[in-house]
């Protein structure tokens, strides 16, 4: 219902400007043409309408200047304090009550931090995002603590968040169980806890991203965990899988036809089944592992990024090497012929014995 006044740009050089509104998809950034009611008798002024939580922007062009274009910032339809799902609010309050030693959670609840809808604010340690519509449902939840924090998350009840699509809580987790059976719309899960012995994701058919461990390859040794059972049955949409610091013994990935990124680190007991059935894989990282020598010898030609730091694996065949764009070298490598890697644009030699003087057919990459 607010008036958006852009009338200052209604005429440029005697030529009327054209205003085009767009609805912005928050996840993809895709724009869809939209219409705003014009204010009568005031060119370039509009009555702003939309569903709570939606984002819009207006593009202004003028034929007097062919390449001239202006855009407003993204404009968000505000939501009232009463327009959030009571069930989701109760779930956030329970999360804080279950972990009374986590001051940041308590402060978030006491201040009604969800009203900030601060998903894109990377300065905040607790961030949320909500669905569009008259009653907002919690779709994204991120909990992060400073590296030197003494807080630990000991209980994690996500059952109230039935519309949750993205959950992330990596550090200072001390949970021993995780129940996501009610989170059937979950697409992105990043979690880590040394006491978590099993994870069942079979009720999450929309899952596309799962990470158990740290955010970055070679970020450093966390404590080894108890994760010995992982059920990914039915997660056929999975595209990214990251596992580390786990005693997990076996994992069948044959049903993940869409899997494009796989990272395994510090999992000494893990054996993979069905690797040859994963035909979409382009990214493979196996640092700090010893058991995948046969796998590395038989990599698919689809691999574009390969990271083998702190391993003793053989370098890939020329058939695979010619397609590589990024390569992390095993520690023993003393020399490298770049002629075998014509498409390589990134080379990580940290921790290896490679020197500039031992690189053959050197070129700028």
Predicted segment positions?
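N-terminal capping/linker segments that flank leucine-rich repeat
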Residues: 1-166, 184, 203-205, 236, ...
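Per-repeat beta-strand-to-loop junction in leucine-rich repeat
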Residues: 144, 168-171, 181, 190-193, ...
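Canonical position 11/12 of the leucine-rich repeat
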Residues: 148-154, 172-176, 195-197, 216-229, ...
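Intrinsically disordered, low-complexity proline-rich tandem-repeat tracts
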Residues: 180, 186, 207, 227, ...
